[in-house]
Amino acid sequence: MSSQARTQTRAGFKAGVKDYRLTYYTPEYTPKETDILAAFRMTPQPGVPPEECAAAVAAESSTGTWTTVWTDGLTSLDRYKGRSYGFEPVPGEENQYICYVAYPLDLFEEGSVTNMLTSIVGNVFGFKALRALRLEDLRIPVGYSKTFQGPPHGITVERDKLNKYGRALLGCTIKPKLGLSAKNYGRAVYECLRGGLDFTKDDENVNSQPFMRWRDRFLYVMDAIKKSQAETGEIKGHYLNATAPTTEEMIKRAEFAAELDAPIIMHDYITAGFTSNTTLARWCRDNGPLLHIHRAMHAVIDRQKNHGIHFRVLAKTLRMSGGDHLHSGTVVGKLEGDRAGTLGFVDLMRDDHIEQDRSRGIFFTQDWASMPGVMPVASGGIHIWHMPALVDIFGDDSCLQFGGGTLGHPWGNAPGAVANRVALEACVQARNEGRNLAREGNEIIREAARFSPELAAACEVWKEIKFEFETIDTI
């Protein structure tokens, strides 16, 4: 380099390290309608000022690095940088804050959940200045959400495909989840569907193991579906898990399911990844099957209150990536989930416009710009005594999935399915008559059991089963 060039470089660039807050903490900034907004729960290391920590979050999740670099002068940092535009202490928590960051839309590739998450949460969570960090919520602007296809079909189209209206859908996960042969698996599916369920389901870890290869399972299951449809006159389905080691193999399995006229297939969206999920969602829209999404591995990411990503963010990103169903917890079953928080992200899955409501953990107003909704699936440790609460909490646009609560019936799978269908229809009728499900739920179930021996037997088996543990992740 010539001496003249060195002189010019020294004149325009000063090497060294400067505080993040000098560039990335901008409390005077007013977010734009086109900005992606993020709310982080931030716990600084002792001695680190919260404004410096907030600025570091904005910097490390956008354009910043640990030192000043001369290439900063080759672009417009003011245009592309993330901005921490405020923070507030978390009530009842010591040295913990909600930090708000605005990201300009140009930082993100259109239609890519993978790129968006890589930018916002890909690196900053390991930053030493932070003791813990959790992404609580995102506001996706209309201009960005319109670059996503979203769910392949959505709730309204699903109801039309199934010709089922005015009640929640009923499902069941086949148990034991592993170890059945394909033929016995198909037999279990048939018994559940003929008893009155709308769907049965592969468990999340049923892929293509030595005891039951995927092709054999698909064939026996479709046999069961067609037989049960012929007997009941209702449209039935089974969530055929197309999750596979490679995207190419996943599409191969999906195509085989479509050749068999399978109405719905399934994907494990977190373990398989967002790129894989978006690929399958687009394929489903083009080829017809509904897409059921399982959230296997979510609790590794979302269960800790102080560090990770809240499930409401994972639910939003799934709606963008694509899925017609998504497991959402139950509130009353065996899995983690408080009522207010669960209802908050259920609305974010289903509704077109959701107002800010901090009491339900919703930090930002979200407008989905007519993107189709995702049907929440309540699953995990539920049985007929939970039915009134489930109908009250989730309403009609949901799928209530009873695994052990169907297959554990003392008379077998079909009577277990009958018990669930009778309980559901009794609760829907009572609600439509104006009765209070929360207060009269047990009485409604007992009244229905007088006319259904299958339901009466189920009431006796599960009368003492409760899952009363304190929720770890509360608002």
From Swiss-Prot:
Top-level division of the source organism's lineage: Eukaryota
Pfam family name, one: RuBisCO_large_N
KW DNA-binding (keyword) present: no
Transition state stabilizer, annotated site positions: K334
InterPro entries for the chain: RuBisCO (IPR033966), RuBisCo_large_chain_AS (IPR020878), RuBisCO_lsu_C (IPR000685), RuBisCO_lsu_C_sf (IPR036376), RuBisCO_lsu_fd_N (IPR017443), RuBisCO_lsu_N_sf (IPR036422), RuBisCO_lsuI (IPR020888)
Any single Gene Ontology cellular-component annotation: cyanelle
GO terms of molecular function: magnesium ion binding; monooxygenase activity; ribulose-bisphosphate carboxylase activity
A Gene Ontology BP annotation from the UniProt entry: reductive pentose-phosphate cycle
Catalytic site: K175 (proton acceptor), H294 (proton acceptor)
Co-factor binding details: Binds 1 Mg(2+) ion per subunit.
Entry EC no(s): 4.1.1.39
Catalytic activity: 2 (2R)-3-phosphoglycerate + 2 H(+) = D-ribulose 1,5-bisphosphate + CO2 + H2O; D-ribulose 1,5-bisphosphate + O2 = 2-phosphoglycolate + (2R)-3-phosphoglycerate + 2 H(+)
Subcellular location as annotated: Plastid, Cyanelle
Predominant subcellular localization, coarse grouping: plastid
Keywords (A to Z) from UniProt: Calvin cycle, Carbon dioxide fixation, Cyanelle, Lyase, Magnesium, Metal-binding, Monooxygenase, Oxidoreductase, Photorespiration, Photosynthesis, Plastid
Cofactor annotation: Mg(2+)
Binding site for Mg(2+): K201, D203, E204
Role this protein plays: RuBisCO catalyzes two reactions: the carboxylation of D-ribulose 1,5-bisphosphate, the primary event in carbon dioxide fixation, as well as the oxidative fragmentation of the pentose substrate in the photorespiration process. Both reactions occur simultaneously and in competition at the same active site.
Similarity comment: family membership: Belongs to the RuBisCO large chain family. Type I subfamily.
Protein name: Ribulose bisphosphate carboxylase large chain
Gene: rbcL
